[in-house]
Amino acid sequence: GSTSFMRPIAVALAEAGYLTVRFDFFGHGRHPLPYSGDITTIEGATQKFVNQTNEIISHYLLKHSPSFSMIIGHSMASDIIIRSASMNPSLNSAVAISAYTDALKAKEPKNVLILNGQWEPQLRSKSLEILQNIGVDNPKEGKLYGALDDNAIRKVDFIKNADHVGVLYSVRTQRELVDWINFLEKDKQIFIGNNIGIWTGILFFSIFFLSILLTKFLPKKSLGKYQFGYMRFFFINIIACVLPPLILYNFTFKFVNFPAHNHLINQMIVISIILFFSLPPTQFKELTKSFNFPLFAFLFIL
């Protein structure tokens, strides 16, 4: 969905000698247009993403006329690329990372590799279920199914020590992809790889600890004296979990065009209202006294 997440993979493939193309889906990354449509139906947002993908595929295949072409998608995009590749027989392979899709068929699309992180047990189980649904008996990770001559290879495997996001930054993922292309093309492209994931992690940790350090230079305020019973705290949490879904199922305000963002905004507003009316009136003064606006502004900007 977002070009920034796919950068390590794209760089690794480019270093191996392949032309790579990254793009942002509607409503993702730097794409100027929002996505729209019902996210719970195939005919809604999914179909619009598929149409967008098909347009990009057609453009670049026509522009470069490659002898080999492959599409890669992660998470939500894994379903999109499987559907799109099934409609584009000129694609030689599709790679679904952290896959969750029901669109895969026995011979469509061509040559499919499914990769999940080791720490994604549900998606790993789902991927084996996908193979079962297309007629593979007792499927195993790391084993090839189908015939290369028929362009119907199917393989599910996992990336060691990786989760839903880490799988995109893992050097092992990069190596798997280069090895997969070499296998399909009977080629021997050299794998170089990159450690963008490690440097990204160092950057985030540095920003995190630097932020903690900078808060020490902000004005301090003494904490108020609160009297908040455990039972009240317990019931507020129960109400905040149960009530918002019941309200938002029947009534929501439209603040933005993004369905997921709009839902989160409504959810936060409802929870804030619940918390506001759950506080004892005598505590509002203490909350106001201890509110640290500079700290709030600093965290908000971050």
Regions found by a protein language model. Name each.
Residues 1-192:
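Soluble extramembrane regions of membrane proteins in the secretory/endomembrane system
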Residues 238-302:
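Alpha-helical transmembrane segments of integral membrane proteins
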Residues 74, 79, 222-228, 254-259:
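Short juxtamembrane and helix-loop transition motifs at transmembrane-helix boundaries
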Residues 181-191, 214-217, 243-253:
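Membrane-embedded alpha-helical segments in integral membrane proteins
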Residues 188-202:
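Juxtamembrane/start-of-transmembrane alpha-helix segments at the extracytoplasmic/lumenal side
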Residues 162, 168-171, 227-236, 299:
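Alpha-helical transmembrane segments of integral membrane proteins, especially early/N-terminal helices
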Residues 153, 232-234, 248:
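Contiguous hydrophobic segments
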Residues 201-243:
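Juxtamembrane interface at the cytosolic side of transmembrane helices
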